[in-house]
């Protein structure tokens, strides 16, 4: 029995070595033409003096490649304190952001799909078609996520300085393919909205991106290495802090003000320019949401929370929504709701001519709070377009930001924010609220107060 096990173990070892040799050949051949930048290059450079060639080869195959594709190798392998090389420290910080973006893709995919489905349901409801049930068929698998990581990494040749969380999310958004349809449930008048999210075709995606044979080979090598190494399971825990809190920023115990009305109508008579998107109308929109006591439900952006949408949200987010189901049903069902960044996106996506809130409309992307703030920083100038709260100018319609949360500055030292499930849309003082920064949203115009 032991001899049989030993023989099987030896055969398995030989097979593993054979696969490793084959993988090493493919990786080396592809890397020779595609180039390996960022963490892989720095890791090799810094570890050459201490590693013999065999160990270096094992490092390349078993550690560097799977980790550098999407995680912060310098932080994990060297640590911040074990390397004084400025380029490695910089690379570590950038790799943490990239790794976090990749490891957030599972939630990103879910929230993106959620936003799309929410928008489709709202369109049907606005056209007079009552949706009784929502069913989502998501056929995407872990392999799709691995292909997204591999193809995107190959497209940037592993150059961490050329990559960003925003670019990764834009790329992932472009890979989503969906098809909505309506059906009668069991032949009854009950209407079901069915949305199918399709799997990606890596060959078609690489063709669309103009990959040559070398780039295809490199992406394939990265995919196989990620899959064989189990890198997602091994290193995903390093980025748990990037997972969203679906219940909002409800831990605040300071003074908050609620509105005194309850109305689902959106009155654009207060807008200074309904046909454009600007800061003054954003502030007016936010104030109106507060006055009318809009609720908070993750993944909504000014939509009326119907029975079918609520049922879908409970299924989609059993913790963040399901755990608060009784409270939401008692307080927010049948009313307009938004999450923190959804309050801002709802204004941007509102078509003032039809009074419909679309999806990713009018140039405003479907970003979370952190991504929206980063986009503003990327597009602006510090001190003029973004900065710390202590430097904030007196301009209504600025976005206020803290990690994972956003609000709208309305002037006079006050903000409107969709605070959390149990708070809804509230008015708070900026001072003492813990805001970390402010920014001008790059997707709307900023007008002066007359």
Where are these regions (language model features)?
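Polar low-complexity intrinsically disordered regions enriched in Ser/Thr and small residues
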Residues: 21, 27, 31, 38, ...
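N-terminal capping segments
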Residues: 247-357, 403-405, 416-418
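Low-complexity, Gly/Ser/Thr/Pro-rich intrinsically disordered linker/tail segments
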Residues: 431-450
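Acidic, low-complexity intrinsically disordered regions
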Residues: 143, 214, 238, 242, ...
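Short, surface-exposed loop and linker segments with low hydrophobicity and enrichment for Pro/Ser/Thr
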Residues: 137-140, 393-394, 432-436
